[in-house]
């Protein structure tokens, strides 16, 4: 293994430990492992088809041997495949030759060795392997890590549901909310995208060189190949069968999947920037870790580095995922090879996503609300009550309510409780309504924010 300090990519260097869970999935070893699984499961279903008499049904012993190779495929095995590829200059053919050699001592497989990779084009193996890799990454890494963020944010939304804060629209003071409600907004957005990721289909095909079962039909015209291949893709591999393809599976589902990940990333970039701003305003403080340095020259600094790191990595992820989404569904005629090298970078987009998730969660775990700063902002901005006052005036038929509050508050400095009190007392509205307005403060003017935050 290369020394991480000498790695070209930071994913395998500085950030290697943070993306360790992805390495067995998206590395070249991971691709080989998936190819072995596809090739051997294809051989198993050929042997189980009575009309393919040249491959008798495998015994339980042979099936167990096949499963053992699938489950124990190792780095040493991968190195042996690479050694074969040095001669073949073809990665999928190297897998086929390695399998023939590996099973030379298993009589039933050795007798049927020419049915390894039977009627397959390389892309039949590759497209299914890529689908398995993406599915594993979703189940083992992406969804659990996203669920962890959602769980953390949900807890924060509940905990901070009643902490009032001044909103800002266009960067200017606006109707109050609560910290918890603003976090709940993000939770809801992420929950929707989580469901989209869960529902994503992973498509596959094994229909030959141009998608028409040409070789299959010549060799065994009596086999219902479409049903056979559908069952293999859906039952043996747990994927979704694509019945209409060229040589390659068209990768539309990949574009959908990468775009779904990108939407999650975009939501987190948005929230990273908001939290960065709230820290700058003093609404949140950050827990200080002993020994850490915030600046090489300014000893006092406690910077929002986790949210900045998250934003940067998620931006990198979206750049890669965006290119994958745009490029992969495009292939000249029945295929060209431009997708092959691009597909080797799936793990890069997912890797930067995982880095962004991890940094965001680290940042969340350092946050502490600063009620004093929140309260001070609200108490200095009584003009926020212009909205409820003019709305109540509308209810009771007071003429030109909006315009009167605009004249009183817009662009004015030092709108005090006393100024608003005098204005309210001058209104010709029912005493009960007047009393409610006089009781109102910016910190109390939060509508259903607390309830909404606790309900998420």
Model-predicted segments: where are they?
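Short amphipathic alpha-helical segments with heptad-repeat character
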Residues: 135-143, 147-150, 154, 184-187, ...
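Generic, well-ordered alpha-helical scaffold segments in large soluble proteins
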Residues: 41-46, 98, 102, 137, ...
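Glycine-rich cofactor-pocket loops
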Residues: 158-180, 285-301, 332-341, 365-380
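Active-site-adjacent "gating/activation" loops or surface patches in catalytic cores
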Residues: 223-247, 251
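Long, amphipathic alpha-helical stalk/connector segments used for oligomerization, subunit docking
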Residues: 309, 313-400, 404
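Amphipathic, heptad-repeat alpha-helical segments used for oligomerization and assembly
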Residues: 240-261, 336, 340, 420-423
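A helix-coil-helix interface module used to build multimeric assemblies
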Residues: 1-216, 220-231, 294, 307-309, ...
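Glycine-rich anion/phosphate-binding loop at the beta-strand->alpha-helix junction
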Residues: 193, 246-332
